[in-house]
Amino acid sequence: MAVLGLSGTVIYLLPFLRELYYEPLQQALGITNTQSGMLTAVFGMTSLATYPLGGWIADRAAPRLLISLSLISTGLLGFIFSTFPSYPVALGIHAMWGVTVTGMMWGALIKATREWAPPEQQGQAFGFLEAGRGLSEAALASLLVAIFANLGGDVPAFSKIVMIYATLHVALGIVAWRVISPGSPVRNETERSGFSDFAAVAKMPAVWLIATVVMTSYCAYWGAYYFTPYASQVFGMSIVVAGSIAAGKIWLKPVAAAFAGLVADRIGIWQSVAAGFVVLFISFAGFAVLPGTASLVVLMIANIVIASIAIFAHRGIYFALLEECRIPPLMTGTATGVISMIGFTPDIFMPLLGGALLDGYPGPTGYHIYFGVIAGLSIVGLLASLTIGRLGVRSAL
């Protein structure tokens, strides 16, 4: 599980370099803000396109093989990127990363996690996966940013950082091949159903319900990206302090995800997801009406902590619904691909919505509307999780 968690973190380091190294990336490639955003957009579009096919492949190949190939191929592309090629080549690399990261890794990672634990411990399995991802994300980010600063913080230093990332990918790919179990009897059965799996999965109401849960929860995850500017622009906090709050919430991820997994196995997955949506609704509704006065700063920070815990708890358990809804193990990858293609569409529309609202309604109003929309979507997620509880646990959907 430690290797799965680390793999699930490391694989996203290269495509999302701009999150930690925004200006160094622009300087190295000589690109504008729009061009920088296009790099991530190309990766996102390729990822969405490859979720279903990647999941289908995950049902036909050993997760160990796919995870290893994903890490190694992504790392090799990273070595090319460390030379800072022309912008068209950089776009091509990001498009290929969409295939090597999402198409190869995601479905295999979810399937390997499901196979790792028995049915009654699925909450723990996915909770520990997300906890491992959160812990390694925070630790690696802190370490590598410090190394970057120590190397001089310039373009040559950034090239070395990219090479370190690439080396880490390749090395972890080799370790994953040696450590991850070669497979379970379920996956090694000879029964295969071809592309008809997509039709079978599409007929399962549970798949659409889980996709709704993931999508609405992921909208809340996108809402968390706006906590930093919300704190600085609405409450007048300094950028440094607001950024520190944002960085601090990252360390909540491993604790919240692991705890949610343990609780979910005790009280039920869908019950835990539903409770999380109740918390998210109350929290984001609070953001939507909270005036930006100095006397309410402590309440605002407390609400950020509460919302972050609920968001990270959800990320730790919502794919455990695959077992609770009795999705056939042979279709885990295909179902994951379809769910992810729908569930992660907020990557496309949430930043556009946020930008439009903040530009159209400057000041607190834009944030209040944005957070209000997320509160409303949390109700949709709550209804989906309650429907799963009413139908999915008693019978295979």
PLM segments and residue spans:
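Extracytoplasmic gate region of multi-pass secondary transporters
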Residues: 18-22, 141, 204-257, 315, ...
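Conserved MFS/SLC helix-loop-helix module at the cytosolic interface between two early adjacent transmembrane helices
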Residues: 49-88
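Cytoplasmic membrane-interface "Motif A"-like loop-to-helix N-cap segments
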Residues: 60-71, 265-278
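C-terminal ends and interior cores of transmembrane alpha-helices
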Residues: 72-86, 279-294
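Cytoplasmic helix-loop-helix junction between adjacent transmembrane helices
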Residues: 93-132
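Glycine-rich segments within core transmembrane alpha-helices of 12-TM secondary carriers
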Residues: 123-148, 340-351
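C-terminal membrane-cytosol helix-exit motif in multi-pass small-molecule transporters
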Residues: 145, 166-187, 384-389
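Juxtamembrane intracellular "pre-TM" segments in multi-pass secondary transporters
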Residues: 182-210
